[in-house]
């Protein structure tokens, strides 16, 4: 995987941190072992944004011909404490279910992003230069979309005539990973 030194034209953004009584460093260490063992990572997440079928998979298909799709992660101090039961199955379509591959653990999540290796990589993202690329909020400026409790989204660069670099509203990110097929799945 190539570590990005400039923000990409399109990406999935996610705030990440401690989860299910596990600190973020432990999660990263576990996920790197998953990658070494299986060649992929199931990065669990929940919430109402970045639904596998309605947002992530269509977004990935829309941009796959333009190059790799990345998950860009911003570390935050999180106290997410969901159910600790590990998922045992995943589904691409929400209908047909398969066992989670041996060596992969997804805890306290409804969905999982399918990733290659997670790499450190500092980027500065200006959300005002991007817009929501799929779903009901398509076309909405990413800076407006991320206000409040929204912690993830599928974003694409705005047309130059609509983009403005708002230096007061920047996001510093610390980690990145390439999103690989099937991009995002349901887990249970």
Give the location of each predicted region:
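Residue-identity detector for glutamine
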Residues: 6, 55-57, 62, 74, ...
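Contiguous surface segments at macromolecular interaction interfaces
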Residues: 1-22, 26, 92-188
